[in-house]
Amino acid sequence: MHWSRFVGIFLVFSVFSLVNCQCDSGELFVVRFPTNPIMNNTRMCMTYDNDININFPTVIKTPIWLKNRLYPIIGRGPEYLKYFSDHHGKEIFVSYTDDLRGPWVVHAPGTLKLSQVLDAFNASSVNDTKSEIASADIYLDHANKTVRMYFHRRVPNDNYAIVSSIAYSKDGINFDNIDTRNIGSAYIRHFVHDGYIYLTDRVGKLWRSRDGVNNLEPGTTTIGDAFTNNSMVNGDGYTGLLRHLGLIKSGDYLYIYGTRIGDSPERILRTKMKLTNDWTTWNAEYPAKEGFRPETDYEGANLPNIPSKKGSANQPVNQLRDPFPFYDMGRCYMFYTVAGESGIAGARLPKCWENK
């Protein structure tokens, strides 16, 4: 091949890659757990055999007051709990461990059930194939020793709109108190800063209130904007836009991780936002940078590299989704779903959030 022709092809390919990636070379340094995947369908109990997808991991370190309440239920007070769900779930799952690398033991009875939510709405599940609950985010209310679960739900009472509600538990397992109010759209994540609880939703819009439930004030969409690739946006409301977020605060910065529908492969992206001055002026750094992408077979790297689509992944695909950053005892971690929604994996970030 003539040298000039080779250079031309290389330049065209490079421009195409930059347009469709919107990332820099500062990829996150991650060390994947040797035990990955730490959760998949083969490790689920018989109760869950009909579930296809695993997504939206949320990991918490178990405080003493919660350990004491878990002991009579599961026979131990585990160090960590991980909540997750099926994409169109009938319940929220929970697993537990004393080591983040696993093994993670699934609590077979599960936690919040769709049937409970339908009962709270006085709705019937007969011939109902549309209702669902999923995407649990957990806030630990230490003052009241209560576990608060933000979750998304679809019920006939709201014409099956995908919105979020809250359930409460004293033990992290039995969520018997359900607040049926619609507090926002789906895929809520939270962080606490300067006396407020802040929430983000699927499109990356920011909300806040003193208690994270009542009198929520709307903020900007700067987080969602940081993950948008305008060259990919086609008007369908999904392609080129944020899928789901994970958040963690360190000092005056919020570190934000997410993935974008339409990327090939869909991979973990990252940005950050300084939390100083008027909250309505906060801006996430644009554009979101490359985090890391599928590299192993269990992450789907051996599968075709094609643009991702909205919705559930019912078969393994070359995608990472649903990042959840986690900090414990001076170490930084990332949990995420692999091969689309085929399982959950974990990694340590030796250089932590700043990648330095």
From Swiss-Prot:
Residues 1-21 form the signal peptide. Keywords: Signal. This is Uncharacterized protein R118. It comes from Acanthamoeba polyphaga mimivirus. Residues 293-317 are annotated as: Disordered. It comes from the Viruses.
